[in-house]
Amino acid sequence: MTQKTAKILVMDDEDAIRTITCLLLEKMGYTSMATPDGETAVEEYRKALVAGSPYDAVIMDMTVPCGMGATEAIKKLKEIDPNVCAIVTSGFASEVNHEELHKQGFSGVLKKPYLSENLRDVLNSLLLF
C-alpha cells in the first residue's frame, strides 16, 4: 500500500512567499498549488473538491491588501467544506490571537517569518496519514 501524498493549497499575495512555501512543501514530499488571494484560493479549493481531488490543507495569509484575506476566505471555505483544514499566516503579532482564530475555523497558525521546521511541525500536527 502506498502512502498518500498530501495536497496543500497556499494563498499569499507575495509572490516570493508563495514560491518559497511551495518549494519547502515539495521538499517535504507534499504536492502544492499557490494562489495570490482568497477569491482565487476559494475557487481553486472548490474546483478540486468537485473534481474529487480535494486539498488536505490550505495555508492562507491573514492580510491581502488588494483582495480577500484569510479571515474572509475561511468563511467561504467552511461553506464549501465544513471540515477544511486551514492554517493562517501573519507577520503582524497583533493579528495572531490563537483562540479567536480557532473560533473562526482555523486549524493552525504560523507566524511569519516561519522556518521550514515550523511549517513541517504545524502540518504534521494537523494531517493524519
Predicted regions mapped to residue ranges:
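C-terminal output helix
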Residues: 114-124
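Short amphipathic alpha-helix used as the core "switch/output" element in two-component signaling
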Residues: 43-46, 69-83
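The short loop immediately C-terminal to the conserved phospho-acceptor aspartate in CheY-like receiver
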Residues: 58, 62-65, 115
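Charged docking surfaces used in two-component/phosphorelay signaling
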Residues: 19-27, 99
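Acidic, metal-coordinating helix/loop segments flanking the phosphotransfer/catalytic sites
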Residues: 34-57
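Acidic di-acidic motifs
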Residues: 12-13, 61, 112
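As written
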Residues: 70, 76, 101-109
